[in-house]
């Protein structure tokens, strides 16, 4: 019995030392998972310099099948003019951090094709440059970043 107690204490001590060594190991961070855009919604938090005479709201939704739908609602300031809604729809590919948009179509809320070829080209040029996903909270998408009028969309967090 006299030999058993010191051996038991030695075993407990050795176990304690071994567990301390495990705690001092450098933890391995989890492998980052690619962010899925499908099923997410984004709202404009900044639309700079596009128009000073109107209130503009934007909402982007990434729906199934690799399609992004951007709805733009324009309400002229100080007049009783009608609200103008435009829907942009494009295919997207997301290779972080770049979001590439292709095959853009624009329609009115009623589903009618919109705009002149020149205006279409300008809008498509802005969006075909894609966007950048900014890693900060809230997550944001930045379109037309290098121009004077970047469009910044923040992710709508589900409650």
Residue ranges of model-derived segments:
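Sec-dependent N-terminal signal peptides
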Residues: 5-13
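Intrinsic disorder/low-complexity segments in short proteins, especially the signal peptide
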Residues: 13-14, 146
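C-terminal motif of bacterial Sec signal peptides marking the signal peptidase cleavage site
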Residues: 16-19
């Amino acid at each position: 019995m006299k030999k058993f107690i010191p051996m038991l204490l030695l075993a407990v001590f050795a176990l304690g030392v071994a567990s301390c060594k495990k705690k001092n190991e450098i933890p391995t961070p989890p492998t980052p998972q690619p962010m899925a855009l499908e099923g997410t919604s984004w709202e404009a938090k900044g639309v700079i310099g596009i128009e000073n005479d109107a209130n503009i709201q934007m909402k982007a939704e990434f729906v199934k099948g690799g399609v992004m739908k951007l709805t733009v609602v324009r309400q002229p300031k100080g007049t009783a003019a009608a609200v103008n809604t435009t829907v942009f729809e494009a295919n997207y590919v997301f290779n972080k951090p770049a979001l590439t948009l292709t095959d853009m179509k624009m329609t009115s809320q009623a589903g009618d094709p919109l705009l002149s070829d020149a205006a279409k080209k300008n809008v498509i040029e802005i969006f075909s440059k894609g966007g950048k996903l900014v890693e900060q909270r809230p997550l944001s998408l930045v379109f037309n970043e290098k121009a004077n009028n970047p469009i910044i969309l923040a992710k709508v967090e589900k409650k």
